[in-house]
Structures are given as structure tokens and as C-alpha cells.
């Protein structure tokens, strides 16, 4: 029988760790938190120094019973939950439930689930750090006080089922503020003049820069004509050539935020999916003969720090694979709020994505490859670029051509951050030419433009903005974005967030009656206070008390003064086939659906069917309709289902293949689409 009991959060983590520790240790999972505030009531006694009332989470009774049974038999109990505030709180709740002594050094933490890291952590157990627990408690209680006070007011005055929260309300504000900027935006006209030039056999482009050695704004067509009428012939003199060597350094290894952003850009993953896959990679992957191994370090972190050991291993790998020139001489100076943490990196550089491919699902492999390449590239030598700026002049009119070539690829051999991929002049190959020589303009083309409104938030940009403004923590970005979508406060159109009417109504009410809650500075200041609680500089109850005294008055004012708002259901444009009443559009868990307006007397509902104007290629009777899976993925089926079981992920276009006469579909890959046959290898030209 095992002498020691180790408790972790998940079965996957338990399975991995038990293999490392041997027969003297039994590792079991608590399945996350075992205690929390009750869902049926506030659970915080504001009259009694904000004392929380914790209860065993519904459904966790058997888990707690099992934990107690094993703890009673064990000589020593170790609490090995995750190395962050949430993990520390889980350990504290477990210690309370199992009646472990406060002074016991039974807390073990590791940043990666590898044999060496886990075994080493058990050599240095420590006590539970109550400052970290208090910071988590303060956050949990703050969120409960906000949510359980504002939400009932919204239910009563606006609509049942609504919610507001400390972080979600600020995230919603960002989306709505951006939408208002777009609505209020007034486009302004401006012009560009671009020229195509030739020197011997080399063709290149240049842009209008100056008139009479001064910037000259091209705000209307008359400005353009003033320039073009001054031009005389096609010869321009090269009046200045500036050559520089530019050093480009690699991006830091990933934090939670930058991982979510880059996975959204490069892999088209939602933040929630990225974190789910990262958790799987962290908790352990079965590598067959090598056993189960955690492939990456802990995935909830603000830090870009890396250990000396990881840096040394990466340096050796780079040296052997690419050569000495590709190793970096820079010492890593990563930084972050959670100093005990590292950046997100592979637990071993030697486990290359190619070697791991057969052990991972496709999406796991794609994310692991991204993390591995970003980390290894961060330890490589910088890239060296040769940049050239060439001024071309005629009659006091100056054009400038910019070009660059890569002298030494360095880290770019392996990985380039998405945003690095769009630099002016990178594809403009300039001729090797000296000052005083002449070039020929083959085409001078003015073009009219209008200023564009700021773009709506993508998920990546919203995460980046939340991080920059210090709204929430690494662990809250994904669930916050998830919540505002589930509540139907925002919708995702073409991968960009648009506020709904409901979202704007809720925001207006929260803004008018709870201005602090949506104030970015207030939210940032609260995060700073929670950090101070974690550092032991301030007590958590003082943070709660200072906030709640004024917030309570806001709640009382809202209950008295907020006017009731009636949100009318959107007419569906058809009548109920059961009772004849008008059908209306409602929002459900999986999106919009039609329901009878005579509810509750008539409970008729039906799905909203979107036809695409194509007859079903199978039964030739029904229409092809667009549907959504439970995972919100669009697919196409027959309107006569279940009589006809036609289904496809790709959109039928209503034409047959000229080669085999099966139906043609539109297949999308990123921003491009292509018409292909659903049966044979027939393809048409790609469309952008």
C-alpha cells in the first residue's frame, strides 16, 4: 500500500505524476475545486467582515469522500495543485476538508510535468502561502458581490438571465466603445501617387514624398493635379541613397496572452480552444516507450522568464541544428508578475514537433509546434536586414523607394511573429545604383482613398487590449470573452465582435448606475490591489470593504431609480402552425430560434433555417440549408431531413462537375476559396 497521498486537479495530471513517483505514492484527482460559494445565494456575509460561506460543490460529495478515505490511510498528504493563486486556493480548501495542520509543509509546486521537475518538487515541499489564497478569495468574493448584486437588478428591470461582472462588463465596454467610434467616424478624402520605375532591367516602385523639399498633403484631386502637371517627361534623378543595416530581434517566448493572440492569428483557434489544448499538453501526453510526459510548461503565466537549464538546452540544439552563427549571445531577461513562473515553452527542446507528431492530435500538434518554434526562435540570433531608401527627384517633386533584403536570416529561419510579416518595402527589390544616375518612370498612378474607421475587435486584438490595459489576469481572458458571447451581448461576425442590441442596453444601464464597474482605471487599480494582497502588503478584507461601501449605495440607487426596459422580441415573419399566433425570434444556448409569441399557452418552437438558393443534389426536391453544429461549426443539409440525409461541410454552389457530374462545392482555406468537385479531382481557379 502507498505511504503517501498526492492530490492534483485532473486525472490526466494524476496519471502522469504517479508514473514518476513510484509505488510509495498514490496520486488522485480532486477534479478541480471541491469547495466554492453557494450558487443559490450570495454566500458572503457583508455584515460579518465579509466572511465567505464555503460549501462542497454539488456533485463533489463522492470525490470528497474518496479523498478523505485515502488521506486517513496515508502517512503524508501532498497537495500538488497548479502553481498559481487558483491552485493555492484549491490546496487550501483541500487542507481544510482533510483537516491537515496549517503548519504542515505539504504543498508541492512544479512549473512543468517532467520526471526531474516533479521529483525535485517533492524534495522541497512548503506550507500553503495564505497571501496567494487571500488574493484568490478577494477576487472570488469581489466577483460574487458584483455579480449577485447587479444581476438581480438587471433581471427585474431589463430581462431575466442577464449578468454583469467586474471584468466582463469592461470587456463589453471595449467592444461597444469601438462600435461607437465606427458609427461616429467621418471618412476623409486623401490621395496617393505611386510610380513604377525602371533602371536597366530592374523594375521597382516608389511613392510621392515631398514637393519643394516639404511634405505636401494630397487631400483632393486638385492637389494631385498640382503635382502631376509639374512632371516633365519620364526621367528622374537619384538624389539620395541611404543604406542601413537593421537588426531584428526575435519575439519573447509566449505568455498566456501572446499565445492566445498568435494561436488566433496563425491557427484560427479561439482563446478557449487554445487553453484547452495547452492544458492537455501541460498535463501529459503518452509517448509510448518514453511514458507519459508533460510537453509544455504551465500555461497560465504573465512571465517571459526562462530557466538557465531550458536556455542551455535550446542553445545546444540550435548550435547542432543550425550552427554557431545562429546562437544568441543575449542573456534572457524575461519579466512578469508571477516571478515563480516561466514563459510557456516546451519542457524539452529535444522533443521536436516532428518527433511528437504521431503522439498528438492534429490540433495538439499545431499548438505544440507554435509553442516550440516560438521558444527556440526566441533563443536564436537576430536577423540582419539591409535596408535601402532611394529618393528620386524631378522638378522639385520627390518620390521615395524603400527596399530591404535579408542579409542573415537568424531566428527568421524558424519562426516569424505574425505582425512582423507586413513591412513596407520588403518585396521591393531596388537596383544597385548611385546618386546622380537617372531612372525611368514607366507609370505614375494617382489613386483616391478615404480614411477608414478603426477595425472591430478580433478575439486576438481583444485579448491584447485586455492585457495592455491590465484588465483581468491570464486565466480570465478566455472565459470573459466566452461569457459575453454566451450572454448574447456580442456576436462574432466574420471573426470580429459586434455588440448586440441587448449588449448595448445592458452596458448603458451598468454605465449609468455602476460607473466604477466599467471604468478601466478602476479595474486596473483593483488588479493592483489584488497583487498587493498576494504580496502580503494589504489585507484582503480591507480591499473588499473599501469597494463595497460605495458599491452598496450604487445598488440601492439602481433598485430605486432604474427604469424598466421592455425588449421586444424580433418578429419572425410567419405564424405558428399550431395556434396561428405570430412567431418571434428568441436567443437560446446554441443561437437564435423561432418560438410562438403565445408562450406559455403554446410552446411551439422551430429552428431558423437559412436557405442558400441551391436545390438538394441528392433528393432533388428539398433546398440546401445552412445549419450549425453544437460546436457552432457551419454545415449544409437538406431541408427535407430526416427524409433526406444529405449533409456536407462545404457549401454546394448549384452546379455539377463537368468531369463526373457530381455536385460542386466552395471550399474555403483562410481568406481564399476554391470551387472543387465533391467527388473527383476537378478544381477551378482560386478566388481571393
Swiss-Prot record:
One of its GO terms (biological process) is DNA topological change. The record marks 33, 139-140, 143, 148, 155, 300, 487 as: Interaction with DNA. SUPFAM superfamilies: Prokaryotic type I DNA topoisomerase. Keywords: DNA-binding, Isomerase, Magnesium, Metal-binding, Repeat, Topoisomerase, Zinc, Zinc-finger. It catalyses: ATP-independent breakage of single-stranded DNA, followed by passage and rejoining. Its cofactor is Mg(2+). Mg(2+) binds at residues 9, 82. GO terms for molecular function: DNA binding; DNA topoisomerase type I (single strand cut, ATP-independent) activity; zinc ion binding. A zinc finger (C4-type) spans 576-602, 616-644, 657-680. Residues 3-113 form the Toprim domain. It comes from the Bacteria. The active site is at residue 298. Its EC number is 5.6.2.1. InterPro entries: Topo_IA (IPR000380), Topo_IA_2 (IPR003601), Topo_IA_AS (IPR023406), Topo_IA_cen (IPR013497), Topo_IA_cen_sub1 (IPR013824), Topo_IA_cen_sub2 (IPR013825), Topo_IA_cen_sub3 (IPR013826), Topo_IA_core_domain (IPR023405). Residues 334-344 have a biased composition (Basic and acidic residues). Residues 322-349 are annotated as: Disordered. Residues 129-556 form the Topo IA-type catalytic domain. Disulfide bonds: none annotated. Residues 163-168 are annotated as: Interaction with DNA. Pfam families: Topoisom_bac, Toprim, Zn_ribbon_Top1. GO terms for cellular component: chromosome. Releases the supercoiling and torsional tension of DNA, which is introduced during the DNA replication and transcription, by transiently cleaving and rejoining one strand of the DNA duplex. Introduces a single-strand break via transesterification at a target site in duplex DNA. The scissile phosphodiester is attacked by the catalytic tyrosine of the enzyme, resulting in the formation of a DNA-(5'-phosphotyrosyl)-enzyme intermediate and the expulsion of a 3'-OH DNA strand. The free DNA strand then undergoes passage around the unbroken strand, thus removing DNA supercoils. Belongs to the type IA topoisomerase family. Monomer. This is DNA topoisomerase 1. It comes from Staphylococcus saprophyticus subsp. saprophyticus (strain ATCC 15305 / DSM 20229 / NCIMB 8711 / NCTC 7292 / S-41). The lineage of its organism: Bacteria, Bacillati, Bacillota, Bacilli, Bacillales.
